[in-house]
A protein has these predicted regions:
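Alpha-helical solenoid scaffolds in large eukaryotic transport, assembly, and signaling factors
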Residues: 1-75, 81-95, 105, 125-129
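Charge-rich, solvent-exposed alpha-helical interaction surfaces
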Residues: 5-9, 102, 140, 156, ...
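Conserved aromatic-histidine-acidic binding/catalytic patches
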Residues: 49, 65, 70, 160, ...
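C-terminal regulatory domains involved in ligand/effector binding and gene-expression control
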Residues: 132, 163, 167-190, 194-195, ...
Length: 316
C-alpha cells in the first residue's frame, strides 16, 4: 500500500483485533519507509480523535511513541497523537492502570520530546483564544462606542489589547488567515491523507520554473508546517502579486528561533480539524475546555517538568 492508502486504512478501520496489533508492531519494528510509518501513525491518531475509544489503537500509538522502537518523525507524530488522545479520553485512560503504565513508559522514553509536544499543544489552543477575545472586545465596546469617550471605554479596550498581545507573544499561528484561503485548493479537497503528507521537494515540479527559486527560499521559513508548504506551493501562481506583501519573507527567514518540528505537526493537526471538510471532530476545543487535564500528574516527567507546564498555563 502507498503512504496515503495506509493512512486511509488506519483512519477508517474499526476495532482492531489482536492479530492486527501484532502485524502492526512487527511492521513498525522492521523499520519500513519512514513516510509510510508516519502516515500510518497519523491515520491511527485521527481514527481515535474522530470516532470512538479503542484500547488497542491507543496501545499501538504508545508503541509508535516509544523511541526505543521508532525514531524521528514517526516518534514525534505518535507522541503528539498520544497526548491528544489522552486528553480527549481522560476518563478511560485514568481508570486503566495497566494502560497508564504503558503510556508512561512510552513518554518517558523521550521526556524532552514529550514535554515539547505538550507545550506545543497548549500554545496552539490559544489561537482560538485570539478569536474569542476579538468577539468579546467587540461585544463590550459596541455599546460604549455610541457614548462619549470615557475612561471606561479606554480601560476595556486596553484590557483586551493586552490580552491579545499576551497570546500572540506565544509564537502562535500569525498567518492563519492567509493560509485559510490557501487550503481551498483541489489538493486538500481530494483526500484527507493529503493534509498529512510530509513535505517533499518533488512537489515543486508543478511550479513554474521561473518561480521555483523564490518558492524554495520561502519554503525554508521556519514558521511553516508541511501542509502549509503544499498549500502555498499549489496556490503560488494565484498569490504571486501579493505574496511579498502578505508574508514578510526576509523578516521571517532571518528569525533565529530554532525550529521545533513538533510545533509544525501540531499546526497541521490544528489546520485539519479547523479547515478540513473531512471531519466534524474538534479535539482542540476539548483541550481548551479541559485545560487542567493537560497537566497529567502521571505523564509529565518529574517535578521540574510538571512545574514548568503549570507555570506555562498560569493566567491562561
Amino acid at each position: 500500500m502507498t503512504a496515503s492508502e495506509l493512512f486511509d486504512y488506519y483512519r477508517t478501520t474499526g476495532a482492531l483485533t489482536e492479530e492486527d496489533c501484532l502485524d502492526y508492531i512487527s511492521w513498525v519494528q522492521d523499520a519500513p519507509d519512514v513516510t509510510k510509518s508516519a502516515m500510518a501513525v497519523s491515520g491511527l491518531t485521527l481514527s481515535l480523535l474522530e470516532n470512538n475509544w479503542d484500547r488497542r489503537k491507543v496501545e499501538l500509538l504508545a508503541t509508535s511513541a516509544n523511541s526505543s522502537l521508532t525514531t524521528g518523525m514517526v516518534t514525534e507524530r505518535a507522541i503528539i497523537g498520544l497526548l491528544l488522545v489522552m486528553i480527549q479520553y481522560d476518563t478511560e485512560v485514568r481508570t486503566d492502570q495497566t494502560l497508564i503504565d504503558a503510556l508512561q513508559e512510552s513518554l518517558l522514553s523521550n521526556p524532552g520530546l514529550a514535554f515539547s509536544a505538550l507545550c506545543a499543544i497548549t500554545r496552539t489552543t490559544q489561537v482560538k483564544g485570539v478569536e474569542e477575545y476579538n468577539k468579546s472586545m467587540a461585544k463590550e465596546l459596541q455599546p460604549l462606542l455610541s457614548e462619549q469617550p470615557s475612561e471606561k471605554l479606554y480601560d476595556v479596550f486596553q484590557h483586551h489589547q493586552q490580552e491579545i498581545e499576551r497570546i500572540t507573544r506565544l509564537h502562535l499561528d500569525q498567518n492563519f488567515s492567509f493560509f485559510k484561503d490557501a487550503y481551498q485548493t483541489p489538493f486538500f479537497r481530494e483526500r484527507a491523507a493529503n493534509w498529512f503528507i510530509p513535505w517533499s521537494d518533488t512537489a515543486l515540479q508543478n511550479i513554474n520554473e521561473d518561480d521555483r527559486e523564490h518558492v524554495q527560499k520561502l519554503l525554508k521559513v521556519w514558521i511553516m508546517c508541511d501542509s502549509d508548504k503544499y498549500a502555498l506551493g499549489s496556490m503560488y501562481s494565484m498569490l504571486r502579486s501579493t505574496l511579498q506583501e502578505r508574508i514578510p519573507l526576509d523578516g521571517l527567514a532571518s528569525n533565529k528561533r530554532e525550529y521545533v518540528s513538533v510545533d509544525g505537526y501540531v499546526q497541521q493537526m490544528y489546520r485539519f480539524f479547523r479547515l478540513s471538510s473531512f471531519t466534524q471532530a474538534k479535539p482542540f476545543d476539548i483541550v481548551t475546555q479541559l485545560r487542567e487535564k493537560v497537566v497529567y500528574r502521571w505523564v509529565v516527567v518529574g517535578r521540574q517538568a510538571q512545574e514548568a507546564i503549570s507555570e506555562l498555563l498560569q493566567g491562561v
